[in-house]
Amino acid sequence: MESGDQAGETSKKKKKGPYMSWSDQECYELTAILVDAIKRGWRDKNGTISKTTVERKILPLLNKKFKCNKTYTNYLSRMKSMKKEYSVYAALFWFSSGFGWDPITKQFTAPDDVWAAYLMGHPNHHHMRTSTFEDFEDLQLIFESAIAKGNNAFGLGGDSNAETFEEEDDLQAGDNVNHMEINDDEVNETLPKEKLPTRKRSKTNRNGDRSDSINHGESSEKVLSEMIGVGTNIINLIQQREERHQREVEFRETEKKKNNVWDAIKEIPDLEDHIRYDAVTKIHTLNLKDVFVSMSVEERLGWIRRNT
């Protein structure tokens, strides 16, 4: 049995293929190609780039420029690293609504008290406050739409290998959701099937005169009425999508505020900063975030006085 297990493990390792490193120039070029691909509309309606598109359009450009032989497996490995990098950036905005982005300096911004609270829980992230991040906007463009739609990353559709690439879908952030995109399939499924009236062939009477069995004026009016009905249905569908999009945005904002420990602490008046910082650390250590934010302001104050 042991030899069989070892053989199975060996075969799994062989499936992964040889490891191929990525140079800085290759990483930069892949990001640039993906950004250009998005602008060209190479994503499908789910917000992802399919395996076929990656293999036929993206990797050939990269391999030709650097005279390398990157495969789809290598691409997935690099995408995993890129999404891990982006998740660190996105975590700032989930920690507190006080974080922002300066597109000129390419730096993350926040008030001093927000940075202090964040760095208390992330002592190894001091560089996030002072460093510049040239690739943030590109990574945001690459990953935000796919994440918001519930997909893992580009090229991770049904034809991808789950063993090769395992993603944690913790991040559901981002308001850059293409809710206003209406595709033909959705319209066809939502609208009733309208059948235009069949025009019957003319009949010939005994005198040889041809007369239409359907009055042409009435037929044209009916067709026009049906076309107006279809147009009205499309307009109603668009309005419904807009309303749903607005509700989803408001819901995410509400959830974001509800789950923000630091904002919940700042609602408590007359607390010194060092007590606030200690409270943040204590709450995260005890994994009591959900309980704490569900308390009233008075209950939060009582909890802090008792536990800090």
UniProtKB/Swiss-Prot annotation:
<dbReference type="InterPro" id="IPR055314">
    <property type="entry name" value="At2g29880-like"/>
</dbReference>
<feature type="region of interest" description="Disordered">
    <location>
        <begin position="158"/>
        <end position="221"/>
    </location>
</feature>
<dbReference type="InterPro" id="IPR056253">
    <property type="entry name" value="At2g29880-like_C"/>
</dbReference>
<dbReference type="Pfam" id="PF12776">
    <property type="entry name" value="Myb_DNA-bind_3"/>
</dbReference>
<feature type="compositionally biased region" description="Basic and acidic residues">
    <location>
        <begin position="206"/>
        <end position="221"/>
    </location>
</feature>
<protein>
    <recommendedName>
        <fullName>Uncharacterized protein At2g29880</fullName>
    </recommendedName>
</protein>
<dbReference type="InterPro" id="IPR024752">
    <property type="entry name" value="Myb/SANT-like_dom"/>
</dbReference>
<dbReference type="Pfam" id="PF24769">
    <property type="entry name" value="At2g29880_C"/>
</dbReference>
